[in-house]
């Protein structure tokens, strides 16, 4: 039997679909799952990146604000110290304020007004440094940066210093200092009021001084007087030399950097008339040495050049409690190294050491260089900070 041929106009029989083609055209379920999962991860990653970026911006602004706060706090701290020893630059009247007083003699040193009083209840001599007029100009610009050092002979260690007044020959001090001395002992004392020209990069120059034998003063009532400055006698103490170093403090990093630059006119320690100097740098806290650094040794010289930097970690909340002590020593290959002199800087040191420290804090991130006169090792110990 043969099948009937299809008649004209009748539809052709349908061919059943090929199952292999169906399998090739369909998308597997695991592919769809992978696509969905990948898309989700991509969206999540994008959102996470945006979130992290915003967080970093916020943290950056916060850290920047904290850094600004640290800088401002340290600057204010430095200004508070400067206010104790060194005011801002003042434009004071440079003409003599006393009628008819003119500085005609080019060798005239100037004059100083002071006051004296004795408090019998507390046993204290009160010395007032009021003002000076017509001081000698020791700077190249025709002016001076005067301050007054006050002490009672024979004790030179207990000194008081006024603030430094910038660029004036007629400073108004208005400061009072107290010396605790029994009244019966005052007759053998001599009051010395020495006027100096402050110089950051060299030794402070003596303008002149006033000496008042206390035996010649009637302290039954307050005394106020003008005295002409006299040429200061040469220091009796042996010169040990000078050292120049810079201080730099970065409050945001809590980093204190001391750069030992150079020394000059050091005391001769060797038989041949020279020395082999090096410098030890100590960081002290509470009067105790907590860190130590030292420079290289410079052979056969009294004017060594170092330019060596040392860094210490000092948190912002500890900067008032630390001091830095620099000791210049003479290296001895066979015997014991002998100290030539020391100098200390810090908030509790006073004098030039406090002045240098205050300038450093008032100018964070900037190195502040200054010359210091070396003191005998037994007299240069810093005062323990509170």
From Swiss-Prot:
One Pfam family it belongs to: C2
Example GO BP: regulation of calcium ion-dependent exocytosis
Main localization of the protein described in the UniProt heading: membrane
Cofactor(s) needed by this chain: Ca(2+)
Domain C2 per the UniProt entry, residue ranges: 108-227, 239-372
Free-text cofactor note: Binds 3 Ca(2+) ions per subunit. The ions are bound to the C2 domains.
Region (Disordered): 1-21
Biased composition (Pro residues): 1-16
Membrane-spanning ranges: 25-45
SMART domains: C2
Record carries keyword Transmembrane helix: yes
Residues annotated to bind Ca(2+) 3: 199, 202, 205
Family: Belongs to the synaptotagmin family.
Cross-referenced PANTHER family: SYNAPTOTAGMIN, SYNAPTOTAGMIN-5
UniProt name for this protein: Synaptotagmin-5
